Amino acid sequence: MSKVTGIVTELITPIVEEVGLELVDIEYKKEGSNWFLRVFIDNETGNIDIDDCRLVSEKLSEKLDEVDPIPTAYFLEVSSPGAERPLRKDKDFTKAVGRNVHITTKEPIEGATTFEGELVSYEDGKLTVKEAKKTYVISQEQIDTARMAIIF
């Protein structure tokens, strides 16, 4: 997590929770000559709508303008995490059991660093991912990125 995303996370988590939503992820990155602060929100049902995004965007914009934690000009975007939402917290992995996931690891496991298949179980920081021909057990510490996956 970058310094900016760490500071922004602390500032905006209470705002998102105050309106009954969950902060899923924050992304701060440069694309071309522009900086973007992307805030991904969700709720228990996974049904975020444009009104939720607008409400959070207005509240965040006000707070960010007041505190001004970002040294450069940027575009603020608030959205749902989408169908391929990132998996970061224990509850994200628990909710994803029985669904398809895409995992990349920091180091190879049995020669591979990318795994895509059904998350069969998640327990004590260990994921069991079943691909078409093989099942892997991956510890959370080994994960570089994890997200939901749509497999055709």
Curated annotation (Swiss-Prot):
UniProt subcellular location: Cytoplasm
Q: What is its main location?
A: cytoplasm
> Which GO terms are recorded in the biological process aspect for this UniProt protein?
ribosomal small subunit assembly; translation
**Cellular component, GO annotation:** cytosol
Keywords for this entry?
Cytoplasm, Ribosome biogenesis
The domain of life for this entry's organism is Bacteria
NCBIfam families, alphabetized: PRK00092.1-2
**Homology family:** Belongs to the RimP family.
Give a short account of what the protein does: Required for maturation of 30S ribosomal subunits.
Q: What is this protein called?
A: Ribosome maturation factor RimP
Which species is this record about?
Answer: Brevibacillus brevis (strain 47 / JCM 6285 / NBRC 100599)
The gene name on file is: rimP
